[in-house]
């Protein structure tokens, strides 16, 4: 479509609006046309949102970690224990992100939100273990390992039942008509399971080493 000194071209993609092929085509069009061309439409909007989201994703995580650490430092009886909590949850997040290869590729929305959501959902497990450990230390003075062993047993009993309901809630997302639901559901359900495992393995080890 031509008018005066401007030309408008309509481009139709064979794939869906947010498909990888469509987004790659938008990138290619922009690289060929340069700054003299303005690309609009849903595919270009999705591509812009994807780029912006991936740029800001690390900032989301940093803000979440800082705010959570401040709250824990103010409410816990130790300023050091929040660091152990963050290290434990951080390892769980890394394991969760690393095991996403089984799905081939995950949505950029899931990738941007998964870390923050996993931190918010699983940090409670660490708090429960810590308080249980403190109670058992009073019952087993001078024997931290025995106190931690009992605390882990109590934590497993309470946390597993709680995590099952959380996992079930995330798996319910898999029944959404949008693929994002299944994507987010699987990643977050897996993240909760890994979070529980790290809570009863990694965190107790760190606490015993530094206590």
Spans of model-derived segments:
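Extracytoplasmic
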Residues: 1-12, 47-51
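Membrane-embedded transmembrane helical bundles of large multi-pass transporters/channels
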Residues: 17-211
């Amino acid at each position: 479509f031509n008018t005066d000194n401007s030309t408008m071209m309509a481009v139709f993609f064979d794939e869906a609006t947010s498909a990888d092929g469509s987004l790659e085509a938008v990138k290619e069009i922009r690289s060929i046309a340069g700054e003299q061309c303005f690309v609009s439409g849903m595919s270009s909007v999705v591509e812009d949102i994807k780029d912006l989201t991936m740029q800001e994703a690390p900032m989301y995580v940093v803000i979440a970690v800082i705010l959570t650490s401040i709250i824990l430092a103010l409410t816990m009886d130790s300023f050091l224990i929040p660091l152990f909590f963050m290290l434990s949850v951080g390892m769980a997040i890394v394991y969760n992100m690393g095991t996403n290869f089984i799905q081939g590729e995950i949505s950029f929305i899931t990738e941007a939100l998964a870390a923050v959501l996993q931190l918010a959902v699983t940090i409670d497990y660490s708090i429960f273990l810590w308080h249980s450990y403190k109670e058992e230390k009073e019952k087993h003075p001078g024997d931290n390992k025995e106190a931690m062993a009992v605390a882990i047993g109590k934590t497993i009993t309470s946390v597993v039942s709680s995590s099952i309901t959380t996992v079930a809630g995330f798996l319910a997302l898999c029944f959404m008509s949008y693929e994002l639901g299944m994507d987010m559901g699987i990643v977050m359900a897996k993240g909760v399971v890994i979070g529980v495992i790290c809570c009863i393995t990694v965190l107790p080890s760190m606490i015993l080493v530094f206590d």
